[in-house]
Design a protein with these regions (language model features):
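An N-terminal assembly and electron-transfer interface module characteristic of large anaerobic redox
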Residues: 1-297
């Protein structure tokens, strides 16, 4: 069986990786995240498991320090002659340490940047075909939505259709969460919030987006507010739960904390006019959170 190694610096991608693995007959994934590499022994074990891999992908979050034992892994894989793809953020080291052809590197990067189960699956198929000699077909990278609605009971549902399932006699609460969590199917905490709201007699309206998106074709939290949370100037929700980690005051971004600004009160949430509650999430795994006495980090 052809083997592909995959390291991801965050656990956010593990949901889509796990689902992709279930679709890959004849392709075995060796997967680790930063939380799996507690010491050098763990790093060495990961590399040992990859010594006969068709290719290895190191999917970093920023620079080299987002992977424990990075230099050892790169040097050892180079010695073994294993094709290596390093995906970093903005640093030349990733290009330098990547050993596959530039065109292949760029295609793999596009799979990873677009993300989601379908792109992880076909990234692995591409690697297995091009570097493992596996007779398998693969699709080009697929563009996924950058904003939309989600509900655990209605996969792939659209905004209007989800609202049609609501009881008009019940309050409606929006649940804002990051597009990347929807893309990689990291939605258990969203599901839990939806279930909790519904058990208390409310309609749950989970919405994903990039809160400060400024790229063409992407809509931000202000657009979501104006188009999905307001109708004829009136709110269609009674409250919002937001798990975004940064300020939603879009026109105040970049302002010094000591400067109240000229328009601190004139932000798009004022147009909505309903309570917005900040929910607290953590990048740590549940097991690490439960075994720690330091609280949420």
């Amino acid at each position: 069986m052809t083997r592909i190694g995959l390291y991801t610096a965050t656990e956010n991608e593990l949901g889509s990786v796990q689902r992709a693995a279930g679709r890959l007959d004849g392709i075995d994934l060796v997967v680790r995240s930063e939380g799996d590499l507690d010491d050098q022994t763990d790093v060495e074990a990961f590399v040992d498991d990859c010594e006969d891999a068709a290719a290895v992908v190191l999917w970093l979050h920023g620079g080299e320090d987002s992977m424990p034992g990075y230099e050892y892994a790169v040097d050892r894989l180079r010695e073994l002659g294993v094709p290596l793809i390093v995906k970093g953020t903005g640093d030349a080291f990733a290009f330098e340490d990547t050993s596959v052809a530039d065109t292949d590197r760029d295609q793999i990067y596009e799979y990873l940047e677009r993300g989601g189960t379908i792109n992880v699956e076909h990234c692995c198929r591409f690697l297995a075909s091009e570097y493992g000699g596996v007779d398998t077909e693969y699709d080009e990278p697929t563009e996924l939505p950058t904003e939309g609605v989600y509900h655990p009971d209605y996969p792939g549902i659209e905004y209007d259709a989800l609202r049609e399932t609501f009881d008009p006699e019940k309050p409606t609460v929006a649940i804002w969460f990051y597009e990347s969590h929807w893309t990689h199917e990291n939605t258990r905490y969203v599901d839990a919030q939806a279930r909790a709201l519904e058990s208390q007699g409310a309609n749950a309206l989970p919405i994903f987006c990039n809160p400060a998106a400024d790229e063409e074709g992407q809509e931000n939290a202000e657009w979501v507010t104006d188009n999905w949370l307001l109708e004829d100037g009136e709110p269609v929700v009674d409250a919002v739960l937001s798990s975004f980690m940064f300020s939603l005051s879009m026109d105040e971004r970049g302002r010094s904390a000591s400067d109240e600004g000229d328009s601190a009160e004139d932000v798009f949430l004022d147009r909505l006019g309903v309570p917005v509650l900040q929910t607290v999430t953590t990048m740590r795994s549940r097991s690490r959170y439960e075994s720690s006495d330091t609280g949420v980090m």
